Amino acid sequence: PDDNDYHVDDTNEYVYNEVAIDYNAGLVGALAGLYRYYGDGEQGIEDFPPYEGNNDEGIYAAGKIEQDNDQRTQVTITIYNETFFPPQYLSGITARYFFSIEELSDYSQDISNVTVEVYYDEGDSAYGEATTVSDPQVWNEDEGICYVEIDWSAFEIYGNREIQIALIAEQAGDYASHWDPNNDWSHTDITSTESATEYIPVYLDGDLYNGIEP
């Protein structure tokens, strides 16, 4: 600060800021001196600094239901990269939304009667990096479990990326739709308010990184 205690908080204003840097360094030095000359017999705080964990939870997915009915589920999926040992951009990230078509099979329908549409892709809109969304794939044919893969693997991501998709069931032979999201694995515990979920598993370089598969 100048003689009138005026300060410009701008890195390029060296005259105003270098003294602040020197002050911070001097304060640390003074504390070290106090400990050296007057700290005989003093003990450091046990378990300080506290352990902050590792990166096991650094990449995860969150879900938010936008629409649910007997025709479709519309869901926003957000992938988070919050790695911090060290913070780093990562490529190779994918996620899977698992769902069941058991209710459709009761009306002689199969996976070919389910389509997926993308309604919003933050990667494409904000960064020009379109997310790849697969067609519905079979996971367990006997149990009618399928999934859609959301693929950001070609891009380096830190922070988060959001995408909104819809799973849509065609009408059956009775001219009605019979979609039921309540038996869908990845629908578990997600509501109209975004929340982190283990039921939308996340993969790194093709290997399961976080979450639970059916």
Give a label for each model feature.
Residues G39-R72, I101-E103, I111, E117-Y119:
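Low-complexity, acidic Ser/Thr/Pro/Gly-rich terminal tails and inter-domain linkers that flank the onset
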Residues P1-G41:
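Aromatic (Trp/Tyr) and acidic
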Residues E102-I157, Q164:
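A surface/secretory-pathway sequence property marking extracellular, secreted
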Residues P1-D9, G123-E129, A176-T193:
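Surface-exposed intrinsically disordered loops and tails
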Residues A61, T73-I77, A95, V148, ...:
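Hydrophobic residues positioned within well-ordered beta-strands of beta-sheet architectures
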Residues W139-P214:
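Terminal connector regions
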Residues K64-Q74, V138-Y147:
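Short, ordered beta-strand-loop transition motifs
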Residues N69-I101:
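Short beta-strand elements of extracellular/lumenal beta-sandwich folds
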